[in-house]
């Protein structure tokens, strides 16, 4: 018995079969994949962090 995993495209929300039949997974198409890449490149998306590092955070490359 083969279970088929289906996910939603992160760009448009269409259902996408997670397998060899969907070469752009988790995206439904090359278009949605490129839209997502463009959002990352334009810094519209970011990975959350605990805070920004600055020169005053008591660290240095010099020892």
UniProtKB/Swiss-Prot annotation:
Record keywords: Metal-binding, Zinc
One GO MF term attached to the UniProt entry: DNA topoisomerase type II (double strand cut, ATP-hydrolyzing) inhibitor activity
Record-level GO BP terms: regulation of DNA-templated transcription
Cofactor note: Binds 1 zinc ion.
Highest taxon, organism lineage: Bacteria
Binding, Zn(2+): 9, 12, 28, 32
InterPro entries in alphabetical order: DNA_gyrase_inhibitor_YacG (IPR005584), Znf_NHR/GATA (IPR013088)
Annotated S-S bridges: none
NCBIfam families per record: PRK00418.1 (NF001638)
Function summary: Inhibits all the catalytic activities of DNA gyrase by preventing its interaction with DNA. Acts by binding directly to the C-terminal domain of GyrB, which probably disrupts DNA binding by the gyrase.
Assembly notes: Interacts with GyrB.
Family note: Belongs to the DNA gyrase inhibitor YacG family.
Protein name, as recorded: DNA gyrase inhibitor YacG
Species of provenance: Salmonella arizonae (strain ATCC BAA-731 / CDC346-86 / RSK2980)
